[in-house]
């Protein structure tokens, strides 16, 4: 849980400025979409092998030490996997706001990044929460990427389930699977609820009908 929470937080911290930067220009939107598409398209084992190759570079002994003694490799792998999902959710959060709000803020002299802090974050926190939950759920269930880079002594829930399945511990597999099913169901329900609430607040309200004279 700790590794999944930390990776989701880092992915969220990267996704927020990227989604906000995407609205500033057409070129920025293309770059951010390319980042999201690449992250979604890359298979998990490819990401894991790329991290192994990077952190075993003999020219960078610091990376070698981090690879052998820290959780940086699996953390980096889970951030790469979770970033595209969080980015797409936050894209919706940013681009669903009325553009008039930002025009008024610019007229008042509010900078671009101050608009993110004062407008987007307070108004779009439900979608922001849904983005974090999506990255967290993906990190919780990841096996294909993290299994290649986990250091000795570190075990994720997905890896534990895989090992119990391999050794035939069916009762433990059933218990862990049920817990994961309930947990993912709760996360999905909360995320859908957050996005539904956000969509309702985004819909323009009809002007009240005038009383007949």
Annotate each predicted stretch with a short phrase:
Residues 26-32, 45-81, 113, 149-153:
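Membrane-interfacial helix termini and adjacent extracytoplasmic/periplasmic loops
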Residues 35-42, 75-84, 136-140, 150-151, ...:
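Hydrophobic transmembrane alpha-helices
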Residues 13-18, 49, 73, 80-101, ...:
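Membrane-embedded alpha-helices of multi-pass transport/permease systems
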Residues 140, 146-192, 197:
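Interhelical loop and adjacent transmembrane-helix boundary motif
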Residues 21-22, 26, 91-106, 110-118, ...:
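C-terminal transmembrane helix and the adjacent membrane-cytosol boundary/short C-terminal tail
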Residues 3, 29, 114-131, 176:
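Start (N-cap) of specific transmembrane helices in multi-pass transporter permeases
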Residues 16-54, 102, 208-213:
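Cytoplasmic-entry segments and transmembrane alpha-helices of multi-pass inner-membrane transporters
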Residues 1-24:
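Transmembrane alpha-helix signature in integral membrane proteins
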């Amino acid at each position: 849980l700790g590794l999944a929470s930390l990776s989701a937080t880092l992915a969220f911290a990267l996704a927020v400025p990227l989604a906000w930067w995407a609205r500033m220009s057409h070129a920025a939107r293309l770059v951010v979409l390319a980042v999201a598409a690449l992250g979604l398209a890359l298979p998990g084992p490819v990401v894991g092998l790329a991290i192994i190759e990077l952190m075993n570079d003999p020219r960078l002994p610091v990376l070698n030490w981090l690879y052998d003694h820290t959780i940086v490799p699996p953390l980096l792998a889970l951030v790469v996997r979770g970033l595209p999902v969080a980015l797409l959710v936050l894209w919706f959060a940013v681009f669903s706001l009325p553009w008039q709000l930002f025009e008024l803020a610019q007229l008042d002299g509010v900078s671009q990044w101050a608009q993110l802090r004062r407008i987007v974050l307070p108004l779009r926190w439900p979608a922001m929460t849904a983005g974090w939950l999506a990255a967290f759920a993906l990190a919780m269930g990841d096996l294909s990427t993290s299994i290649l880079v986990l250091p000795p002594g570190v075990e994720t829930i997905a890896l534990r389930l895989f090992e119990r399945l391999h050794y035939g511990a069916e009762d433990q597999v059933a218990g862990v699977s049920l817990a994961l099913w309930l947990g993912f169901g709760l996360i999905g329900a909360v995320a859908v609820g957050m996005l539904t609430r956000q969509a309702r607040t985004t819909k323009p309200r009809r002007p009240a009908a005038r009383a007949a004279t």
